């Protein structure tokens, strides 16, 4: 079979924070697939980089009193350390702030311009008069122009789900300085995604997407064929001051970070190609026969399935073979939380003494090819790792290796290796390979654990510890241990993409060459004696998990410290009279039912009891902070006399009160109000 040529990427982590376990879902998912492809003998390159440009990096560097370059260099070192700790096997890990990326950005931009796909337009934006800078969407907050909810970002309302432009906000303020922004016009550059050529191409390209959810989402964005295009042109420029690449021929204008970030995939590969003598153009040119896959989170599907392929298609590059999106991570059924200690950083996991392969295995046991979210249930994590990896898999070697080394000098009984159990394991190879290829890791590991159960059943039946007591059963002992260790070798082949360090330990003690998929058709040889068994993995101790949570838990005092130090908060509203306040009817309400709103990643639909003899329907933009299961049965506070509002999902008959920080990036979290014990539905608050 001819080896496939495959270029693989994961989304680029932003150079403004630490790697946490939510990030690791994607990198572990990608790495397992890449390691499997290498084991299959394919030529595969896995490249990544830090996403380094943009306003947040610039402002953080300013806050720390260092240059943006010093900041991104430090963060790169931290990110690379974390990826190495979790065995993420990049062939090249680079930075978007690299000369290769600058040149590629300029080349792609000029090619799109030559195709008449770049337009210059005047754009009115908010400008911070204190910081003397234009404000990106997420650095402006104010009141929603539709429902009036306060403290909403400049692009969308988390309460009613409305999207808008920043200049639509009422009473806006700068998250950076707290100042009231002014409106200013500026020339911006747009990629003309609405061009009929882009629409025609994207309708053809979407047909090859592997994930139905992604294809359906793209069809939703593209709209019905034959109707007017629903695609909007994309603003690819930002005004100085900005940390990034200046646009050719446009002084003071910079490429938007979301333009240069995906191009960073190619920049990293070009850097690798120069070092290894790879023909870069043969891999990424328009006639390339190589495969190209992007693993991403579902929140950035829009950029990777609309802008990125269209940019590549019309600038003279090949387009992605496919884009694979995954869901979000929750911990114990809830969004990761600093106060609960479940916002777990990669470094804290390692520092606590936790084995990275425990997490690799657990994530793999939960991952499939869909975009559904996955949950890290800590009790299940302990139980599954201890049961599957230690109790089932590692236990096979520990039960057989000692006898073989002590009684038979480590030499297997080759004649015994014709056992039907081993043929059963080998026959599973095509199915295991298919499941890895399809990214159905949970199914692959379920199958491998079924095979592991069969091997343990064999060991339990043969009872080598009993055979060892009777010298007349020496041959049976030799055969049982030989079959057990050969079975263990085959199981290790199947598990190697997930637990590569354990596999390396197995290779050493079994005295075999590095295992690849072809090793399934080989077997242990008496000419290469098995070495003394070395411990491969320890059990998870619940105390370690407790220590991990404690290490990541922030006290309320620590969380509040930035505000005390003078961080920007929403300005206090104008003074009102007691009569004004009396117009707002705040009531205690019980959450009777709660469910996610189909088609929205922000809203929850709540059924509330206000003691009126009927229930009310209320939509609330708190899905990022709570699961429906967490809210049912709780008491909360509602604006009861708010006029009903018709939304595309239904009518909302009130507003649930929730608190959040002015800068949710710096201090993430939404918190609904809960009355103390004793309050009952219908009580008025005043």
UniProtKB/Swiss-Prot annotation:
Q: Name one GO cellular component term.
A: cytosol
Record function comment: Is required not only for elongation of protein synthesis but also for the initiation of all mRNA translation through initiator tRNA(fMet) aminoacylation.
Q: Hey, which family's this protein in?
A: Belongs to the class-I aminoacyl-tRNA synthetase family. MetG type 1 subfamily.
Subunit structure comment from the entry: Homodimer.
Name of the coding gene: metG
The short motif 'HIGH' region is annotated over 13-23
Domain spans labelled tRNA-binding: 580-686
Taxonomically, the superkingdom here is: Bacteria
Q: Indicate which residues form the motif 'KMSKS' region.
A: 335-339
* MF-aspect GO terms: ATP binding; metal ion binding; methionine-tRNA ligase activity; tRNA binding
The species this protein was found in: Cupriavidus necator (strain ATCC 17699 / DSM 428 / KCTC 22496 / NCIMB 10442 / H16 / Stanier 337)
Q: What is its cofactor?
A: Zn(2+)
Q: Which UniProt keywords apply?
A: Aminoacyl-tRNA synthetase, ATP-binding, Cytoplasm, Ligase, Metal-binding, Nucleotide-binding, Protein biosynthesis, RNA-binding, tRNA-binding, Zinc
Where is the secretion signal located?
A: none
As its record notes, the protein acts as a catalyst of: tRNA(Met) + L-methionine + ATP = L-methionyl-tRNA(Met) + AMP + diphosphate
EC no.? 6.1.1.10
Query: What Gene Ontology terms for biological process does this UniProt record contain?
Result: methionyl-tRNA aminoacylation
Fetch the InterPro entries from UniProt: aa-tRNA-synth_I_CS (IPR001412), Anticodon_Met (IPR041872), Met-tRNA-synth_bsu_C (IPR004495), Met-tRNA_ligase_1 (IPR023458), Met-tRNA_synth (IPR014758), Methionyl/Leucyl_tRNA_Synth (IPR015413), MetRS_core (IPR033911), MetRS_Zn (IPR029038)
Identify this protein by name.
Answer: Methionine--tRNA ligase
Pfam families, per this entry? Anticodon_3 (PF19303), tRNA-synt_1g (PF09334), tRNA_bind (PF01588)
Gene3D superfamilies per the UniProt record, alphabetical: HUPs, Isoleucyl-tRNA Synthetase, Domain 1, Methionyl-tRNA synthetase, Zn-domain, Nucleic acid-binding proteins
């Amino acid at each position: 079979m001819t080896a496939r040529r495959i270029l693989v990427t994961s989304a680029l982590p932003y150079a403004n924070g630490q790697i946490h376990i939510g990030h690791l879902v994607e990198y572990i998912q990608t790495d397992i697939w890449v390691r499997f492809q290498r084991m299959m003998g394919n030529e595969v390159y896995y490249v990544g980089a830090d996403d380094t440009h943009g306003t947040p990096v610039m402002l953080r560097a300013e806050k720390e009193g260092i240059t943006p370059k010093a900041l991104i260099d430090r963060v790169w070192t931290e990110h690379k350390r974390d990826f190495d700790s979790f065995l993420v096997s990049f062939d090249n890990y680079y930075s978007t702030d690299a000369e290769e990326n600058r040149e590629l950005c300029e080349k792609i931009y000029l090619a799109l311009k030559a195709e008449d796909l770049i337009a210059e337009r005047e754009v009115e934006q908010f400008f911070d008069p204190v910081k003397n800078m234009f404000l990106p969407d997420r650095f402006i907050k104010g009141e929603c122009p539709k429902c009036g909810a306060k403290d909403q970002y400049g692009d969308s309302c988390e309460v009613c789900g409305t999207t808008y432009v920043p200049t639509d906000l009422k009473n806006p303020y700068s998250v950076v300085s707290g100042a009231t922004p002014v409106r200013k016009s500026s020339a911006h550059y747009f990629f003309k995604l609405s061009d009929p050529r882009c629409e025609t191409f994207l309708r053809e390209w979407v047909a090859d997407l592997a994930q139905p959810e992604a294809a359906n989402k793209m069809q939703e964005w593209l709209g019905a064929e034959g109707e007017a295009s629903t695609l909007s042109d994309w603003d690819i420029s930002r005004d100085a001051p900005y940390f990034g690449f200046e646009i050719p021929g446009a002084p003071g204008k910079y490429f938007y970070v979301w333009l240069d970030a995906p191009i960073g995939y190619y920049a990293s590969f070009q850097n690798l190609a120069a070092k290894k003598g790879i023909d870069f153009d043969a891999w990424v040119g328009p006639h390339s026969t190589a495969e190209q896959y992007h693993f991403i989170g579902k929140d950035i599907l829009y950029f990777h399935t609309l802008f990125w392929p269209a940019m590549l298609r019309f600038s003279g590059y090949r387009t992605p073979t496919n884009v694979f999106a995954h869901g979000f991570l929750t911990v114990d059924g809830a969004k990761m939380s600093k106060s609960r200690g479940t916002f777990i950083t990669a470094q804290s996991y390692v520092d606590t003494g936790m084995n990275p392969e425990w997490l690799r295995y657990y994530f793999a046991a939960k991952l499939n090819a869909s975009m559904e979210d996955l949950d890290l249930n800590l009790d299940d994590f302990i139980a599954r790792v201890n049961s599957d990896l230690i109790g089932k898999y590692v236990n096979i070697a520990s039960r057989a290796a000692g006898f073989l080394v002590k009684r038979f000098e480590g030499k297997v009984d080759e004649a015994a290796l014709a056992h039907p159990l081993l043929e059963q394991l080998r026959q599973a190879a095509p199915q295991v390979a298919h499941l890895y290829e399809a990214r159905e890791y949970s199914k692959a590991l379920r199958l491998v654990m079924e095979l592991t159960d069969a091997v343990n059943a064999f060991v339990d039946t043969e009872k080598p510890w009993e055979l060892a007591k009777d010298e007349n059963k020496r041959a049976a002992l030799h055969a049982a241990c030989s079959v057990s260790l050969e079975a263990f070798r085959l199981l290790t082949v199947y598990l190697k993409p997930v637990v590569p360090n354990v596999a390396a330990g197995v290779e050493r003690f079994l005295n075999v060459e590095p295992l690849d998929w072809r090793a399934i058709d080989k077997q242990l040889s008496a000419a290469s004696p098995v070495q003394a068994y070395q411990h491969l993995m320890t059990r998870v101790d619940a105390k370690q998990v407790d220590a991990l949570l404690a290490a990541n838990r922030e006290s309320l005092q620590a969380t509040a410290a930035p505000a005390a130090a003078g961080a920007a908060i929403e300005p206090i509203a104008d003074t009102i009279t007691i009569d004004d306040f009396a117009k707002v009817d705040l009531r205690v309400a019980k959450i009777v039912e709660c469910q996610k709103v189909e088609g929205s990643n922000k809203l929850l639909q709540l059924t509330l009891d206000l003691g009126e003899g009927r229930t009310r329907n209320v939509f609330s933009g708190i899905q990022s902070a709570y699961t429906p299961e967490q809210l049912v049965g709780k008491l909360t506070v509602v604006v009861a006399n708010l006029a009903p509002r018709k939304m595309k999902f239904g009518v909302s008959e009130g507003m649930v009160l929730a608190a959040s920080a002015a800068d949710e990036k710096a201090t993430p979290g939404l918190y609904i109000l809960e009355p103390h014990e004793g309050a009952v539905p219908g009580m008025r608050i005043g």
